[in-house]
């Protein structure tokens, strides 16, 4: 006859110290990782705001240029923008050439060359009074007139805006558009 001895063991309750230490380490690693993401997200949010400000300003300035007639009066054709800057619109006597700020082509995209010196009446500095850090934007543009000298059929505007000052480095914003009859 076989006797089986069974001993009633009480079930374990709670966690061992090793399990608690492992859980604590995992929790701390997660908290440190999240803590590092907060400053990075704040910086990216600031940069996105700055890029958006430059783009909105570039769009407003380009809209004012596009609102001018193709055969604008004056020699050379010009207008005064909403910020009281005199803006040249290109000389019809020099068709099919880049007039104004120098342009470079990178990856088949025409961009304003901000390494070159500014060209009078084809550039200005804009101080953003709504920005508490006092950011200044360097605004430059080039115009390419298509026509035969006396008759203008189209104008291509390449406008670039670059932030000067502030925290960090920001790529310039470039808008390229054409208006024709």
What are these regions (language model features)?
Residues 4-7, 23, 170:
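Exposed boundary/loop context
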Residues 15-59:
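Aliphatic-rich helix starts adjacent to a transmembrane/signal segment
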């Amino acid at each position: 006859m076989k006797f089986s001895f069974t001993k009633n063991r009480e079930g374990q309750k709670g966690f061992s110290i090793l399990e608690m230490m492992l859980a604590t380490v995992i929790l701390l690693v997660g908290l440190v990782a999240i803590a590092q993401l907060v400053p990075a997200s704040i910086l990216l949010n600031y940069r996105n705001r700055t890029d958006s400000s430059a783009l909105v300003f570039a769009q407003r300035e380009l809209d004012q240029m596009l609102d001018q007639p193709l055969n604008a009066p004056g020699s050379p054709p010009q207008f005064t923008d909403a910020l009281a800057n005199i803006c040249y619109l290109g000389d019809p006597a020099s068709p099919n050439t880049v007039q104004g700020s120098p342009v470079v082509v990178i990856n088949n995209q025409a961009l304003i060359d901000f390494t070159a010196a500014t060209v009078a009446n084809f550039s200005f500095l804009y101080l953003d009074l709504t920005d508490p850090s006092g950011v200044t934007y360097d605004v430059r543009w080039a115009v390419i007139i298509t026509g035969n000298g006396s008759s203008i059929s189209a104008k291509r505007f390449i406008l670039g805006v670059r932030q000067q000052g502030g925290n960090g480095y920001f790529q310039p914003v470039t808008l390229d558009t054409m208006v024709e009859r």
